[in-house]
């Protein structure tokens, strides 16, 4: 690291934002190809490119923060603001889905039969798998808080145990959601109910997968002693994101599964 007279991180040119954008284009185009032409080739290419980008970008950030010491308190403050703004943007993103749902359900049109759920739709029982999913995510919220407090107290083993439990619960939630989709008596093409249900819960499921990936990276970093009790923003950001995913699910459960059924 060359001598510098300021606390800011002057980032080196990186190809990963470009490859990340290209992978996003390939994945969204691949999703359309899969839906309309039953071909997964483009989607698989997009997912592969995305995984490679994630690995290499995370590797660079770990190198800059842990080994080169670029993440000074000033830089960490900027990263905190960035993560907060990112979560706010995600809140607005999900607000759009809730808006679509309530716009359709509070005043059902004659085309829907003037009722909600629309005529012919058999909604899922909110007291079965959705309630179990709620319990799983609430438990994961407790375990991630346990992990955070263990890290701040310097208790490495408890932190690893709690983080592993959180990851396991996240994976379990994803499997439950997949089984629910498989057994659902309606599809994404079943009018406004199907589209709002699958888009809202599907994007939440995607965020659970992203959050689980974030936590898995933190787990391996903790195994390599990357975090200390006062320098662990990578884990803190993952914990914030996980709590956000928890809260969104509670709104989804109350709105779409319970009230909407």
Swiss-Prot record:
Highest taxon of source: Eukaryota
Stretches assigned to the Mitochondrial intermembrane side: 35-40, 106-128, 184-190, 257-261
Enzyme Commission number: 7.1.1.9
Top class in the EC scheme: translocase
Membrane topology, Mitochondrial matrix segments: 1-15, 67-72, 153-155, 224-232
GO biological process: mitochondrial electron transport, cytochrome c to oxygen; respiratory chain complex IV assembly
Catalytic reaction list: 4 Fe(II)-[cytochrome c] + O2 + 8 H(+)(in) = 4 Fe(III)-[cytochrome c] + 2 H2O + 4 H(+)(out)
GO cellular component: mitochondrial inner membrane; respiratory chain complex IV
Topological relation to the membrane, as annotated: Multi-pass membrane protein
UniProt subcellular location: Mitochondrion inner membrane
InterPro entries xrefs: Cyt_c/ubiquinol_Oxase_su3, Cyt_c_oxase_su3_dom, Cyt_c_oxidase-like_su3, Cyt_c_oxidase_su3-like_sf, Cyt_c_oxidase_su3_a-hlx
Keyword terms, alphabetized: Membrane, Mitochondrion, Mitochondrion inner membrane, Translocase, Transmembrane, Transmembrane helix
SUPFAM superfamilies linked: Cytochrome c oxidase subunit III-like
Transmembrane region(s): 16-34, 41-66, 73-105, 129-152, 156-183, 191-223, 233-256
UniProt GO molecular function: cytochrome-c oxidase activity
Keyword check for Transmembrane: yes
Assembly notes: Component of the cytochrome c oxidase (complex IV, CIV), a multisubunit enzyme composed of 14 subunits. The complex is composed of a catalytic core of 3 subunits MT-CO1, MT-CO2 and MT-CO3, encoded in the mitochondrial DNA, and 11 supernumerary subunits COX4I, COX5A, COX5B, COX6A, COX6B, COX6C, COX7A, COX7B, COX7C, COX8 and NDUFA4, which are encoded in the nuclear genome.
PANTHER family assigned: CYTOCHROME C OXIDASE SUBUNIT 3, CYTOCHROME C OXIDASE SUBUNIT III
The family this protein is said to belong to: Belongs to the cytochrome c oxidase subunit 3 family.
Function summary: Component of the cytochrome c oxidase, the last enzyme in the mitochondrial electron transport chain which drives oxidative phosphorylation. The respiratory chain contains 3 multisubunit complexes succinate dehydrogenase (complex II, CII), ubiquinol-cytochrome c oxidoreductase (cytochrome b-c1 complex, complex III, CIII) and cytochrome c oxidase (complex IV, CIV), that cooperate to transfer electrons derived from NADH and succinate to molecular oxygen, creating an electrochemical gradient over the inner membrane that drives transmembrane transport and the ATP synthase.
Protein name as it appears in the record: Cytochrome c oxidase subunit 3
Taxonomic source organism: Cephalophorus natalensis
